[in-house]
Each structure stands twice: as C-alpha cells, then as structure tokens.
Regions:
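Solenoidal tandem-repeat scaffolds enriched in leucines and small polar residues
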Residues: 89, 95-122
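Non-catalytic, surface beta->alpha helical segment in thiol-disulfide oxidoreductase systems
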Residues: 30-71
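Short solvent-exposed coil/turn linkers within tandem alpha-helical repeat scaffolds
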Residues: 49-52, 81-83, 99, 114-124, ...
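Thiol-based oxidoreductase modules, predominantly thioredoxin-like and allied folds used
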Residues: 1-20, 32, 38-39
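Structural register within alpha-helical repeat arrays
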Residues: 89-96, 126-131, 147, 163-164
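Alpha-helical repeat scaffolds
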Residues: 71-78, 103-114, 138-152, 174-186
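TPR-adjacent "capping" and linker segments in tetratricopeptide-repeat scaffold/adaptor proteins
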Residues: 65-88, 151-155
C-alpha cells in the first residue's frame, strides 16, 4: 500500500488546526478529520476519502483515484454518455455531498428519489435524509421533524435529531436546542 502511494502520489500532510492546513480545509470544503484530499497538478480535486477505511478498501480506493475511476468526473462522464442508473446517480450525489456542493447533491438525490423510488434501497434512504436535512438548513424548521415522523424506522432518525440540535446550538436558539434534546432523551434513552 505504501509502495503504491509513493509511486502514484505526492503526499503532503497538513494539520487543520494550523494556518495553512486550515486554509486548505476551508478551500476544499472539508468536513471532518481525517480527510484525505487528492488533487491534480493544477490543484483541481480528483477525489477525497473522509474518515478511516479498512486497508483493503483503502487500497482499492486509491487505485481507483490514481486511475481516475469512480471519481466525480468519471461518474459525470458516464452519466452524460447515457450510463444512467440508481448507482451512478447516487454516486454523483454522494460525491457532491462530500464536497459540500449541496445544491448539486440536491439535484441528483432528487433525480434518484423521483426516478428510482425504492424505499428499501440504502441510496434512497440516504437521499431522503439528505433532502430533508437540506430543506431544514435552508429554513424549513419542520423538514427533519416531518422526515422522522414519516420514516420512524430510518437509520437516520438519530442523525436528524442531532442535526437539529447542532443547528440550534450554532444559531444560539437555546430553547429549541433544549427541546430537541428533551425529545431525543425520550426517544433514545
């Protein structure tokens, strides 16, 4: 794995808490650490890995990245050539979501939900949650509550409440924040 990385990439490590690292973190809309960003010689993003991956999965991902396979640009090119499926559309949406290009993620998640309505699909579930979250952040305070009430078995219910709490905490709406915490304690003891 290290040999492959040394042959195919020039690795630089920056700390997001230091000035230069923080600049890159903001420039590329990074969300959390660890956050591995793969850029070409012009500084254009090729792909990213967010979080930790098991070694085998990591090697497969970096091999794909080195070949520019299964990247956003690859998926978009395939989509434009007519390779249209739930997998391709979901992959594009998730790549945009990772980049925090939320309006573009909304576009593709909306296509996924409209054209491939399979409530048992993990992609469908993720798309529904993302769209509700985006609506909430965009000002519809009922979007996530509506999502939770209509999807009580969703694996994203806890995340929906957590997103509401963080939003209210960050916007210093203490009463709403405490109200959501209270609901969470009754639902997730």
């Amino acid at each position: 794995m290290q040999g492959f990385s040394k042959e195919n990439f020039i690795s630089l490590k920056y700390n997001a808490n230091e000035e230069i690292g923080n600049q890159y973190f903001k420039q590329y809309n990074c969300q959390s650490v660890p956050h591995l960003l793969f850029v070409d010689s012009k500084g254009n993003e090729v792909d990213r890995i967010i979080g930790f991956l098991p070694p085998t999965e990591y090697l497969i991902r970096i091999e794909d990245i080195a070949q520019k396979r299964n990247t956003l640009n690859d998926y978009l090119a395939r989509y434009k050539k007519g390779e249209i499926s739930a997998d391709i559309i979901a992959a594009i949406a998730m790549k945009y979501e990772d980049r925090k290009e939320n309006d573009k993620a909304v576009e593709f998640y909306s296509i996924l939900i409209r054209d491939y309505p399979d409530p048992s699909s993990e992609y469908y579930k993720q798309g529904k949650f993302f769209l509700a979250s985006h609506e909430f952040i965009s000002g519809n305070e009922n979007a996530l509550r509506f999502y939770v009430s209509n999807n009580p078995d969703s694996p994203f219910c806890f995340d929906a409440y957590r997103k509401m709490v963080y939003h209210y905490a960050n916007s210093e709406q203490r009463e709403k924040e405490l109200s959501i915490y209270s609901e969470m304690l009754s639902l997730f003891p």
